[in-house]
């Protein structure tokens, strides 16, 4: 079974906002499957807008049903073709927060190059790094699979598909870098989710 959900430990009342129970054929794209020397890629829909003043990038509510189904089937297709082998959907933590969850569960160091991150026109770097896109994924890809990824995404002009970093051996940590140098964003001494590669 596949079980998932969202809850909030700080809520003044007991609530579960989303829950999922079902079966999948696989292969499963667990974030634990990332390996050292994998490349970190972002796949996200740039055709959208922020919802009101919230950090939510809405690329769904104005999209056609046909396009939504096309996007829905893309990641499973890439998994079945063994083009990507580990992934994590970009969640409320944005690109940077999701990278932390990815590194924590994979037990790897992730180095993100901020200057490689593509974003929609008119969106600031900070807003894009921290927003919750309705369609966005961080993916672990072997360098040898990159040509196949680019070919598979050729028909998706609305999607950002860019190499933004790398996985390395070492403690679970995330570094961000640009032309001015690199800085530590997070390391395992301060657990985020507590779901580590070891457990």
Region roles according to the model:
Residues 140-147:
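Helix N-cap motif at beta-to-alpha junctions
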Residues 64-134:
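Active-site-proximal betaalpha loop/short-helix elements
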Residues 1-52, 166-169, 177-179:
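Glycine-rich anion-binding loops of enzyme active sites
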Residues 1-6, 83-90, 110-114, 158-167:
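Flexible, glycine/charged-enriched surface loops at secondary-structure junctions
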Residues 104, 129-133, 145, 154-157, ...:
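A structural signal for short secondary-structure junctions
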Residues 155-199:
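Acidic, Ser/Thr/Pro-rich beta/coil linker or hinge segments at domain junctions
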Residues 37-39, 134-137:
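Short, surface-exposed beta-edge/turn micro-motifs
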Residues 52-68:
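Short, compositionally biased
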